[in-house]
UniProtKB/Swiss-Prot annotation:
Name of the molecule in the record: Neoxanthin synthase, chloroplastic
Tissue specificity as recorded in UniProt: Expressed exclusively in chromoplast-containing tissues of flowers and fruits. Expressed in preanthesis flowers.
The keyword Metal-binding belongs to this UniProt entry's keyword annotation: no
Organism: Solanum lycopersicum
Family from the record: Belongs to the lycopene cyclase family.
Length: 498
């Protein structure tokens, strides 16, 4: 939802492999002269005609590299030794490198392209970045957000929203890393090897770099983090575009957080039926009368919703809104794993970012949370590596993993995962009813929930308030669809408390 920005617009810290779909208009094995097309086929063909609109426009933006004089590891040196090796130069990786290195810890950051611009758009609540001292990294702010529940009801939220300036944020983090003498190495990490008190990474060019601790910040697709439970994720999937348009219907002082309306599918019965079961919403950032970021998003599904389906719904929506796209500036394909189990705690490789479990299980938000938790993890690392006792090996791994995931934070995450499991059981009508009640709550509850600021007790109170504010149908949804996820929640909380 945040990039999609998105958790997982070419998502997040390290972009996962995008889902790509290929449409073949006239397969050679079908003969139109001998086969009569079914009604379903005709409906699909109608959608395909729409599908050929702005989706056929190539993005005009080109990959950009930043001009920063960073310090490189000597590729010819045979003795590259560091305290901490960070795999990945996404937002989470650079934030951690900045935070750890300011304590005098020797840090090396390894990435295939450390100076390349991040490809995603990131959205955050303005107060989140203000609290982190990063408000100067926002390039646009909206004083209000809105949520369209249906054609007859809209919620207006007095909480400012902002778009992160990828360039400003990356420059800020890189410059801090330069000041703190962080070293960079341009390569892809193929393997991580461990000894009792030391680990090594092996890069695709054969280079080996040694360190006391390896932290994986390479994103969701990483193979370096281990799990001891099945990874039953939910998935957020979205298609986002920054586009130049003739005009659009959005108020420039309001960011559209969610638009759950489905009137745009009135002439698309095939799409409308599917949307009623597994709904998608529009996320919109209007910058000017002719410039807007648009994203069609499946909040969470299991298995992941078809990417082709998401794009077709977006085409139908923009056509209904009368938005004519003149050019596509940027395009994002985003898939974010949400919820599921945490990595095995502890283990030899530390994690931060998409593969560490910090993605909000109910919303997909992660960037602001990564910025907030990197200093927490940095302190745990420094307590080990910066101590006079020189803690290494298993003691260090235990300290850093539990620094990121203490018991209370693990229990809170289980509660947010319960929220995700509830969303998975709701159709469009149920989802609308839930958000109608959710945004009627005291702002401290809905704001705290979306920003991962609530305790287990506060989340319990939120649930009671939600039940009280909900319609009779919402209460029925909760009573009939939540018992099994609730049993799982209680079981998981019991396991975490052992």
């Amino acid at each position: 939802m945040e990039t999609l920005l998105k958790p997982f617009p070419s998502l997040l810290l390290s972009s996962p492999t995008p889902y790509r779909s290929i449409v073949q208009q006239n397969p050679s094995f079908l003969s139109p002269t001998t086969k009569k097309k079914s009604r379903k086929c005709l409906l699909r063909n109608k959608s395909s005609k729409l599908f050929c609109s702005f989706l056929d426009l190539a993005p005009t933006s080109k990959p950009e590299s930043l001009d920063v004089n960073i310090s490189w590891v000597d590729p010819n040196s045979n003795r590259a030794q560091f305290d901490v090796i960070i795999i990945g130069a996404g937002p989470a990786g650079l934030r951690l490198a900045e935070q750890v290195s300011k304590y005098g810890i020797k840090v090396c950051c390894v990435d295939p392209s450390p100076l390349s611009m991040w490809p995603n758009n990131y959205g955050v609540w303005v107060d989140e970045f203000e609290n982190l001292g990063l408000e100067d990294c926002l390039d646009h702010k909206w004083p209000m957000t809105c949520v369209h529940i249906n054609d007859n009801k809209t919620k207006y939220l007095g909480r400012p929203y902002g778009r992160v300036s990828r360039k400003k944020l990356k420059l800020k983090l890189l410059n801090s890393c330069v000041e703190n003498r962080v070293k960079f190495y341009k390569a892809k990490v193929w393997k991580v090897e461990h000894e009792e008190f030391e680990s090594s990474i092996v890069c695709d060019d054969g280079k080996k770099i040694r360190g006391s601790l390896v932290v994986d910040a390479s994103g969701f697709a990483s193979d370096f983090i281990e799990y001891d439970r099945p990874r039953n994720h939910g998935y957020q999937i979205a298609h986002g575009v920054l586009v130049e348009v003739d005009n659009h219907p959005f108020d420039l002082d309001k960011m559209v957080l969610m638009d759950w309306r489905d009137s745009h599918l009135g002439n698309e019965p095939y799409l409308r039926v599917n949307n009623a079961k597994e709904p998608t919403f529009l996320y919109a950032m209007p910058f000017d009368r002719d410039l807007v970021f648009l994203e069609e998003t499946s909040l969470v599904s299991r298995p992941v919703l078809s990417y082709m389906e998401v794009k077709r719904r977006m085409v139908a929506r923009l056509r209904h809104l009368g938005i004519k796209v003149k050019s596509v500036i940027e395009e994002e394909k985003c898939v974010i794993p949400m919820g599921g189990p945490l990595p095995r705690i502890p283990q030899n490789v530390m994690a931060i970012g998409g593969n560490s479990g910090i993605v909000h299980p109910s919303t997909g938000y992660m960037v602001a949370r990564s910025m907030a938790l990197a200093p927490v993890l940095a302190e745990a690392i420094v307590e080990g590596l910066g101590s006079t006792r020189m803690i290494r090996g298993s003691q260090l791994y235990h300290r850093v993993w539990n620094g990121l995931w203490p018991l209370d934070r693990r229990c809170v995450r289980e509660c947010y995962s319960f929220g995700m499991e509830t969303l998975l059981k709701l159709d469009l009508k149920g989802t609308r009813r839930l958000f109608d009640a959710f945004f009627d709550l005291d702002p401290k509850y809905w704001q705290g929930f979306l920003s991962s600021r609530l305790s287990v007790k506060e989340l319990g109170l939120l649930s009671l308030c939600l039940f009280g504010h909900g319609s009779n149908m919402t209460r029925l949804d909760i009573v009939t669809k939540c018992p099994l996820p609730l049993v799982r929640l209680i079981g998981n909380l019991a396991i975490e408390s052992l």
